[in-house]
Regions:
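Short, well-structured alpha-helical interface segments that form or flank functional binding sites
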Residues: 3, 13, 43, 185, ...
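Negatively charged
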Residues: 124-532
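Membrane-proximal N-terminal amphipathic helix
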Residues: 34-62
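N-terminal single-pass transmembrane signal-anchor helix
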Residues: 2-29
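Periplasmic/extracellular, small/polar-rich flexible segments of pilin-like filament-forming proteins
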Residues: 54-132
Length: 532
């Protein structure tokens, strides 16, 4: 007989079997569905990455995603994976940044923070920090630091600045376009543009410098050993102050420079390591400041024959510690407007300096002018010192054995002669024309001087207060101080210490007693007497 329905026992058995089947099968079914979704998601991600790569990426020869192009906006990549090792940053003329990041060959887009309209963008993976700002329409400010890496600047007139950075752990470049033409005009201010730059190469071949007026400090402390500036248009430049200060360029050919509008060349080659400087085309007719221009420069010779110095007022430290053993063109210098020559040849390596045409009638300071100079002789016969007030250390350590023209010096306005001939190698000093009536300090004036003969017959020391160490270790055998009035002197300590003098004359017995009073600082063989 046909059975029409399941018994209760049979139903329970069926339900039990189905329950067992569900318990066993459902997880597998769920996993299968999940795997399908993940597979679909992976496919979507792969397609998205491929699309992104096609729009933004550039693969290298090995197929590795190497570089990015067509950057997207900061906000478009925000809140996505922040792991990255490459980035491209662009700035528009308002200072807004657009960024694309790529991480570890995984085609990921990272995130980056954009701060305001003057965007500061930092790419930091422990190796580099990049910060760049474009501010006012005519001024370029920067702060670019790259730790233990290398970067190279290039310029394109249509796209602007480009900087290629190479991390110390990688050879892959990171291309970052910085500020280019601002308001669609060529930059007029290149002041300090490559200051402290660690770029080993600076390509300026496409520079448009036709509107530039300021190149002050442009390559200051730049480590680039070679600079090709032949394409520079400097026709509108007015200041080159410190332009190559501390530059590591080994040679500088500036023969194409138009310097006709330049007024400031102070510190231009300060601490420059360039051993060769081609300045043959320099027009310096408008230059007013040449202070420290070649200080510590490593140029072995200087040809300044083309220099027109008729408007220069400041030559302070111009050749201070210059390595040039020869300086051509000094005899052509027009120095009629120069007011300060302090330290001008201080520690200069030039063994011969022709100052025959120097007009020093406007000079007020000759402080340390020949301090440590390597010139073996000095002819100052043309010097007009009538307005000089400071001759402190003027010949300190000078190796010149002869100094011509001292007998013509007009020192009527000089107030400071301290250390004037300290350690000077001059064997004889004719100071018979010296008017020292306004001098207040003569401390160390002849300390360690090698002059065996010193004519002090015209010295008026009535206003001098300091004679400390004045003749210490002086080689002069006779000290005729019979013109000296020491009534206002407050310090005579060590005045004759280790002096080689054996004969001394004083104006009055009171002066003689003062000179003889110190037995500790006066040689035992030197006794001062009143000159009859």
């Amino acid at each position: 007989m046909k059975k029409n329905a399941f018994t209760l026992v049979e139903l329970l058995a069926i339900i039990t079997v189905l329950a067992v089947i569900l318990v066993i099968a459902v997880p597998k079914i769920i996993n299968t569905i999940k795997d399908a979704k993940i597979g679909s998601l992976k496919s979507s991600v792969i397609l998205l990455a491929k699309d992104a790569e096609e729009e933004y990426g550039i693969r290298d020869a090995k197929g590795t995603l190497d570089q990015v192009k067509n950057p997207i906006k900061c906000e478009d990549v925000a809140n996505i994976d922040d792991t990255y090792d490459k980035c491209q940053i662009k700035f528009d003329k308002e200072g807004n940044a657009t960024v694309l990041l790529n991480a570890n060959e995984k085609s990921k887009f990272g995130k980056i923070g954009c701060v305001g309209t003057k965007s500061k963008v930092e790419c930091d993976n422990g190796e580099m920090t990049l910060s760049k700002r474009c501010t006012t329409p005519d001024k370029l400010e920067y702060n670019l630091k790259f730790v233990d890496g290398q970067y190279t600047y290039t310029y394109n007139g249509s796209t602007g600045w480009s900087v290629v950075l190479t991390d110390k752990t990688s050879t892959d470049p990171v291309t970052t376009e910085l500020c280019g033409t601002i308001n669609e005009k060529p930059i007029a201010n290149m002041k300090s543009m490559f200051k402290d730059s660690k770029a080993e190469s600076i390509d300026t071949s496409s520079f448009d410098t036709s509107n530039v007026t300021n190149m002050g400090g442009m390559f200051e402390n730049s480590v680039a050993t070679s600079l090709d500036l032949s394409s520079f248009d400097t026709s509108n430049v007015t200041t080159m102050w410190g332009m190559f200060w501390g530059s590591k360029a080994t040679s500088l050919d500036l023969s194409s420079f138009d310097t006709s509008k330049v007024t400031a060349m102070g510190y231009m080659f300060y601490y420059s390591v360039a051993t060769n400087l081609n300045l043959s085309s320099f027009d310096t007719s408008n230059v007013t400041n040449m202070s420290n221009m070649f200080q510590e420069s490593k140029a072995t010779s200087l040809d300044l024959s083309s220099f027109d110095t008729s408007n220069v007022t400041d030559m302070v430290g111009m050749f201070y510690s210059s390595a040039a053993t020869e300086i051509k063109g000094l005899e052509k210098f027009n120095t009629s407007k120069v007011t300060s020559m302090s330290h001008m040849f201080d520690s200069s390596a030039a063994t011969s300096i022709n100052l025959s045409n120097f007009d020093t009638s406007s000079v007020t300071s000759m402080d340390s002018m020949f301090n440590g100079s390597a010139a073996t002789s000095l002819d100052l016969s043309s010097f007009d010192t009538s307005n000089v007030t400071d001759m402190n250390a003027m010949f300190w350590g000078s190796v010149a054995t002869t100094i011509k023209g001292l007998e013509k010096f007009n020192t009527s306005k000089v107030t400071n002669m301290s250390s004037m001939f300290y350690a000077s190698k001059a064997t004889s000093l004719d100071l018979s024309s010296f008017d020292t009536s306004k001098v207040t300090s003569m401390g160390g004036m002849f300390w360690n001087s090698k002059a065996e003969s010193i004519d002090l017959s015209s010295f008026d020391t009535s206003n001098v207060t300091d004679m400390k160490r004045m003749f210490q270790n002086s080689a002069a055998t006779t000290l005729d101080l019979s013109s000296f009035d020491t009534s206002n002197v407050t310090d005579m300590s060590s005045m004759f210490y280790a002096s080689k003098a054996t004969t001394g004359y004083a104006r009055t017995q009171e002066d003689a007693d003062r000179f003889n009073a110190s037995t500790t600082s006066r040689p035992s063989g030197l006794t001062f007497v009143v000159k009859s």
